[in-house]
């Protein structure tokens, strides 16, 4: 009897300690005539989560439903976190790119829907952008309605937004941290074009607020960074 009771207790303990997997829920967010396929990743019903917003690359692609899957690429880095986390991603598409007011508003409408669903308040967010998803980070930083705690920009080029010195002086840009992962073998955004901009941008913000991780072997795709510089990504995700 004692042995049976012990085995039963161990079985219950094993079930209780088994990590709860993230669940992905898909939805569409509409702003005016624009409809954005979107998704939210969560564990159960979080009460005080950190919220991450993923801005996908290929913002003017004719593949207009990237938001259904894009944010899922961050989930493996949150699985073992002791904190409650939510990831959301929306879709940009063709002329509705990351720097248009409509798509930037879509992000906040999505966050509003997450607030309503889980009965929580989202005051601050962390942003992750890959390739031209970095433009979404810049746009939301300047025009989004929520404060930004931290940003991770992977293989990006923000020179289309503004020159580095002027952008770094914007009040909202100076709130929250900036972390850049940039590669020397990025064929889309060559380092001889991107690094001078980044160096000037971070020189104004200062080393405590703005960090550049450069790998001369680094390629453009997120998959290269997950395979070769996973530690830099984990440093961003608590």
Over which residues does each language-model region extend?
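Cell-envelope and extracellular/periplasmic
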Residues: 54-62, 115-118, 130, 137, ...
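Loop/turn elements at helix/coil->beta-strand transitions in domains of secreted/extracellular proteins
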Residues: 47-51, 83-86, 121-124, 145-151, ...
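The feature captures the conserved acid-bearing segment of alpha/beta-hydrolase catalytic domains
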Residues: 150, 155-230
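Short substrate-entry loop that stabilizes the transition state in hydrolases
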Residues: 48-97, 160
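Sec-dependent N-terminal signal peptides
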Residues: 3-13
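Alpha/beta-hydrolase active-site loop
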Residues: 98-118
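A domain-start/cap signature at the N-terminus of enzymes
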Residues: 15-51, 130-132, 139-144, 196-201, ...
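Primarily recognizes the serine-hydrolase "nucleophile elbow" in alpha/beta-hydrolase
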Residues: 117, 123-172
């Amino acid at each position: 009897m004692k042995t049976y009771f012990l085995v039963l207790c161990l079985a219950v303990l094993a079930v209780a300690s088994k990590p709860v997997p993230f669940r992905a829920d898909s939805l569409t967010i509409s702003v005016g005539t624009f409809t954005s396929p979107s998704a939210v990743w969560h564990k159960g019903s979080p009460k005080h989560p950190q919220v991450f917003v993923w801005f996908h690359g290929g913002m003017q692609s004719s593949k207009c439903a990237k938001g259904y899957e894009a944010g899922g690429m961050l989930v493996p880095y949150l699985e073992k976190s002791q904190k409650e986390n939510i990831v959301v991603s929306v879709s940009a598409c063709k002329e509705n790119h990351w720097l248009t007011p409509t798509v930037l508003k879509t992000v906040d409408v999505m966050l509003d829907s997450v607030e309503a669903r889980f009965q929580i308040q989202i005051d601050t967010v962390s942003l992750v952008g890959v390739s031209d998803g970095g433009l979404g980070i810049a746009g939301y930083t300047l025009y989004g309605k929520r404060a930004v705690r931290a940003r991770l920009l992977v293989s990006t080029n923000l020179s289309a937004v503004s020159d580095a010195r002027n952008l770094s002086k914007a009040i909202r840009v100076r709130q929250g941290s900036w972390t850049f992962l940039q590669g020397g073998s990025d064929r889309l955004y060559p380092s001889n074009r991107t690094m001078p901009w980044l160096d000037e941008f971070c020189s104004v913000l200062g080393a405590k607020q703005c960090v550049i991780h450069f790998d001369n072997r680094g390629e453009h795709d997120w998959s290269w960074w997950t395979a070769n510089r996973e530690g830099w990504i984990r440093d961003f995700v608590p």
